[in-house]
Amino acid sequence: MQPGGQPDMSALLAQAQQMQQQLMEAQESLANSEVHGQAGGGLVQVTMKGSGEVTSVAIDPKVVDPDDVETLQDLVVGAIADAAKQVTILAHDRLGPLAGGMGGLGIPGL
């Protein structure tokens, strides 16, 4: 505090810059993290980066049926949705405490 009860603007600015740096580091860490989603009891598995990029899809041969492609398609979509949910949880865990200190910064779900 400065004389007269006014906040020290340089200290507030330094604190905001530090919080911004921490948030940027957490966002980069999140983008480079990997999560796994699955469907059909693990018959279809998806690996996704925190950025949302799908990096691998593994399909158990037991679920491949040329006469029932729709089931396989549904399982792939389900596994991707599960991985996306895991990214959301990870983002909330890593970014939530930081963004909360900055008023949420308009980040959905935080």
UniProtKB/Swiss-Prot annotation:
**Record keywords, A-Z:** Cytoplasm, DNA-binding
GO cellular component terms, alphabetically, are: bacterial nucleoid; cytosol
InterPro entries linked: YbaB-like_sf, YbaB/EbfC
State its location(s): Cytoplasm, Nucleoid
| Molecular function as annotated in GO | DNA binding
Its job: Binds to DNA and alters its conformation. May be involved in regulation of gene expression, nucleoid organization and DNA protection.
Q: Which PANTHER family match?
A: NUCLEOID-ASSOCIATED PROTEIN YBAB (PTHR33449:SF1)
Family that this chain belongs to: Belongs to the YbaB/EbfC family.
Q: What's this protein's name?
A: Nucleoid-associated protein Mkms_4993
